[in-house]
Each structure stands twice: as C-alpha cells, then as structure tokens.
Amino acid sequence: MGRPWVDHPSWEVVAEASSAVGKDVARLLLDAPMEELTQTANAQLATFVQSLVVLDAVERVGLSPAACAGHSLGEYSALVAAGAMPFSEGAALVVARGDAMAHAGEDAPGTMAALIGISDDDAEAACHRAEGEVWVANYNAPGQVVVAGTSDAVAAASEIARDLGARKVLPLPVSGAFHTPLMAAARPALRKALGDVAFSAPEVPVVANVDAREHADPSEWPGLLSAQLCGPVRWRQTIEALSGLGATTFLEVGPGGVLTGLTRRCAPEAQAISVAKPDDLDALLDAVAGGHAADVWHHDAHAHQGEHLYMSERVVVSPCSGIFMPESSLAAPGTGLLPGTAGHATDPSHVRTGDLVGRVGVTEVRTPFEGEVIRWLSVAGERVQEGQPLVWLRVSGERR
C-alpha cells in the first residue's frame, strides 16, 4: 500500500504516526497481510496516514489547499489539512474511531451495497419499502448511492432498487453498516476520544459530511464527527458546496482514486486530479503551471507555515547530487556557528516557506517549511547525494 512512497522524504510522516499511536505503521503499510490490513481499525489508520504522506508531498512542492473536505474517514484528513487539529491527535482519534466502529459492527452486524443508475429519491424509497433496518449511507454522485443496514434489509432494498431502475447493485466488502444507526454503539467511545482533541478554527473552509456546509467554529467539529458515524455522507452536496465557494479544481490525496471519479460526475466542468503515488505529482504541477489549479490550491503556503501536519521537527533534503553551499545569511547569531558547519545552533535563524537555504551545484534548495534552523546536517563544500538531509528545522505553527 505504501511502498511507492517509502523512499520519498514525506515517508517521515509514517514515523511520526507510529510515535503518536504506539503502532508500527510502516509495517502496516508495507508488510501487513491483506487480511490484517483490511480489518476496519487497521484500514482506517493506514488510509489516514498514507493520505497525509501524500498531503505532505504536495505541500513540499509549494501547494496548499484553499478549501477541504473528506469522504467519511477522509474528513479527519481534511481537518488536519486545514489546520483544525494536530496530526498526532488526528492519528490517535482515527485509531479510536476504527476500534469503536469495529466493535459496533460486531455488536450490530450489517453490510453495504452501492446502487448504480438510480436517483437519490428512488434509493430512499427502496429503503423505506424494504421495511427493515436499511438506510442511505452515502450520496456519492448523481446515479450512485450507497445503502447500508442489516444483510437481509440491504438485500431487500437492493431488489426493490432494481425494480425502480437501478442498473447495477454492487455489494461492498465491509464489516459493518457504516453511517447508519447501527453504528450508534461506537459513538460513546468516539465522543470520549474527541474530548481529548484540541480543535482549532480551520485556516481554510472545511465542508462537513453530515450537512454539506462549511463550519468555521472549532467547537462544532466534535459533534459533527460524532454525528457522521450514524448519518449519511452527503458527498454530492459537498462537491456542490465547494463549487459554490469557487473551486474548479479538486485534488484527491491518498490511496486509490475513487473520489476523483465521483467528483467528475458531481462537477463535470471541474478539473479533478488524483495523487496516489510520487509520479502523480508531475501531473499536478503541470496543472498548476497551466494556471488551472490556482483557485483551490495556494502556490507557496506561507499562511500555513509551509505545512499542516504540525510536526515539531523536519529536515530539508537535497534535491540532487553535487557540492552543497549553504546560504550565508543563515549564520546563527551569537553562536559562532557558520552556516553549513554541522552542529547545533543555540540562537537559530528563522526561515520562511520558500526561503533559500543553499545550493547544490547550481540548483537552489528552498525550504518547504517555516521554522528555526536548529542544526546543519551537511557542511559547506560537502558532496551530497539526492535526498541527503541538509538542515534540521523546528517548524513553526506546531500544535501540541
């Protein structure tokens, strides 16, 4: 799952996640057998972390979102991306959510099915006529609705949906009836975990799943995330809301590309791009260079301190091989420590996102983060390799 990213600088996000949750997330992403990886709790943690690995990679090239939303679990990634909660607390919250949902699925077994080629109204009618515990769980796109409930009720609603014109019914390989009242048993544990999170006002608009509205008040998000467990994901309406905010380019970060396809159906006039592996960054940069993504992606992320993961320390790495020469203006005042002299800075220089920290050969090295230089990791005149750490920063904007 995560192997394409293992040699990318953003892979360090995985170590931060492992430290935050006390689990070997790298093993989960690289070596876990499919049976283990697809367990609800593991799948949610792996997806969350990999999505933020991709977000980190996107922000390393100088882009940050102008608005955010996430489908189901993705809402947690969206809140981290918008600066509304710290990465470490988000990771711990995802673990609590996954465990709670897995237990709820055991207590109240259920399943889900995608109905293709049917309207929202007909999908709702199929659920009502089934006369069992079945509800619409996802309003994904025009002509695509997901229903969830007990196995018998979902089967009955699926047959009624076929009678109402559904072209196809696709049973989903899930371990519970997510986003329905059958998940009610998960809410107490999630509420408790939400109480431990220090939510902040989002730095950019975040549109919620449960009502497809922007919520800027941080005190509202615990209730919204709790309600999401038992209420439908209104994804089609969410894309419409983002379009109403002026978005014409949508970027999906993380494994797969399902949301990209859904977005194209919800907003056919918009540009939708998926970044799932490092090679996809080139297509993203091509889109930005063509001026197509300026509405939803800020180029150069000063307003977000260069990143949204709020990790305490980061490194700037060499983009290529060659001789490293540091930027002379970054000498640490009062320490006698020259730039590029490996060692600690007791009175560190401050750098902003995009600042020049040196050159490798003729290639400029600019920091994708804002923070304080606390240690030079390569000395002036040293021959460095691509990906070799050059300078160690304590990032600004961290939230502990």
What are these regions (language model features)?
Residues 59, 162, 240-246:
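Non-catalytic positions within long, well-ordered alpha-helices that form the structural scaffold/packing
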Residues 299-370, 374:
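Acidic, low-complexity mobile loops and tails
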Residues 372-390:
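Short, compact, well-ordered microdomains
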Residues 271-295:
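Short, flexible loop segments at boundaries between secondary-structure elements
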Residues 356, 362, 389, 395-396:
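Short, surface-exposed secondary-structure boundary micro-motifs
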Residues 19-23, 33, 82-231:
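Alpha/beta catalytic cores of group-transfer enzymes, especially the acyltransferase/condensing modules
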Residues 1-123, 168, 172, 249-279:
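FabD-like malonyl-/acyl-CoA
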